Amino acid sequence: LHVMVLERGYVGAPSHFRLLIAGMRPHPAAEAYLRLRTLPAEQAQVDWSHFGHLQIGRARRPLMAFVMVLSHSRMVFLRFFLDARMDSFLRGHALAFIAFAGVPRVLLYDNLKSAVLERQGDAIRFNPTLLALAGHYRFEPRPVAPARGNEKGRVERAIRYIRDSFFAGRTFTDLDDLNAQAQAWCLGTAADRRWPQDGALSVRQAFEAEREKLLVLPQREFALGERVAVTVDKTPYIRFDLNDYSVPHTHVRRTLAVLADEHTVRILDGSAELARHPRCWD
């Protein structure tokens, strides 16, 4: 357009021309948002958030926060992990359900790989491990629409609140100390804040009413633990998550299985346990 008007005798500056054109362009219609209202125990929102790194010995581990928020009462569950692997994701759910003493009926997720492997429009292929967890606890996993982060605004705001009210300026000795402080904060400061739907009530009071309507926890625990196949070379060690763990020398040049949780690494040959080691994070 600028070239065209120059050919017709326009002598103004390009910046002035851009201002003139900007005033003539049609503006996109403002998008309206509905305020989210949920029934007690109807929904929770889940997300990961990165909180920097921890130096453990020679290793620099990411500090990841698993956050779950009950959409009705705004009760927050917070747990820090040294990774965002699937086992940590599942463990965060299990610990949150224990903390809430029940399970919400719907869990809302962003389209993270731990929840959604593939999505084409409304056709969703869930992570089968998450579906197994959902079947065990009887909740419905539900991803938000792509580029619709506002649909899980409760957990996004909770993460900002965690950064400002809990994490900023906090000191801790190790991950266990940080998680102990996080638990105390969730049950104290975060629970005592004003409930947004009724300023006369606290989040704690709203949660006490909501807790009665949560789904009952199953009698047996969900089987947690990361299981991976590993190959033993000519030396009697396997490599798992940046560290070497010993196995009996009789099992060199074999394919074995590792079953690991936060604290322990077990090495299996079929169902037989060959070795058990404390998990090393450095």
Predicted regions mapped to residue ranges:
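RNase H-like two-metal-ion nuclease catalytic core shared by retroviral integrases
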Residues: 109-110, 120-121, 139-163, 176-178
